Amino acid sequence: MRRGARGSTNLGGMTWQEVLEFNANSTPTKLYPDRDIPLQRSIRPEELLELRFYKEIRTSFLDESAFYIRRNPISVVQRNEDGLVRYSDRNKPKRKNDNLSLSDLDLDPKFFPEELRKTLGAASATGRKRARRKLDMKTFIDFTIKAQDLKDESSEAAHPNIEEEPDEGLEEEDEDFGDDDDNDYGENYFDNGEGDDYDDYDGDEGAIYE
């Protein structure tokens, strides 16, 4: 007598023999059609030349140009001659892309007007750079003093000094006014009162006024 129940496999009404026969008669799925894959050929000389030109253009206009904005303009990786970036390039030294001024750039003066060449200090039409003049302090001071003198002279010419003549009539009036100072008020100011006429009194009564 068997104890317990063992697990049974439900084959959907099929026996093991039928399952084995089904697997034996099954055919594999179809694969992609056969195709001859060509081997990679070597790079031709004209392709190497095109690649070198592409690298020079990309380096001059994108990587090293002062007018190109990128996320990380601090350093530029030195690439190989074929222009491809490899994983091993991370160990190569990096060069900084410093901000260059217009005078440091290799500009062609033929593409700039004459007035812009002088302003930017670029080469002139003859191909020579504009000579820089040094500032002479003595000449600068003399020029400043001369300009100040000319300014003062022009100011004096525009507003000449007019001397005012004294008024003779006013001086005569002042003299006449000084002669009239000796009047009766000056003589009577310190009068002792001898000319006043008062009644005598004993002192017990108050002053009597007429």
From Swiss-Prot:
Q: Which residues carry this modification: Phosphoserine?
A: 103
Question: GO cellular component annotations, sorted alphabetically?
Answer: cytosol; nucleus; RNA polymerase III complex
The record's principal subcellular location, in a coarse class, is cytoplasm
Q: Which Pfam families match?
A: RNA_pol_3_Rpc31 (PF11705)
Does this UniProt record's set of keywords contain Phosphoprotein? yes
Q: Keyword annotations for this protein?
A: Cytoplasm, DNA-directed RNA polymerase, Nucleus, Phosphoprotein, Transcription
Localized where? Cytoplasm; Nucleus
Example GO molecular function term? Answer: DNA-directed RNA polymerase activity
Q: Which GO terms describe its biological process?
A: transcription by RNA polymerase III
**Record's superkingdom?**
Eukaryota
Region ranges (Disordered): 151-210
Stretches with biased composition (Acidic residues): 163-185, 193-210
Keyword Transcription regulation carried by entry: no
Summarizing the function annotation, the protein's role is: DNA-dependent RNA polymerase catalyzes the transcription of DNA into RNA using the four ribonucleoside triphosphates as substrates. Specific peripheric component of RNA polymerase III which synthesizes small RNAs, such as 5S rRNA and tRNAs.
What the record says about family reads: Belongs to the eukaryotic RPC7 RNA polymerase subunit family.
Subunit text: Component of the RNA polymerase III (Pol III) complex.
Would you tell me the protein name for this molecule? DNA-directed RNA polymerase III subunit rpc31
Species name for this entry? Schizosaccharomyces pombe (strain 972 / ATCC 24843)
Q: Which gene encodes it?
A: rpc31
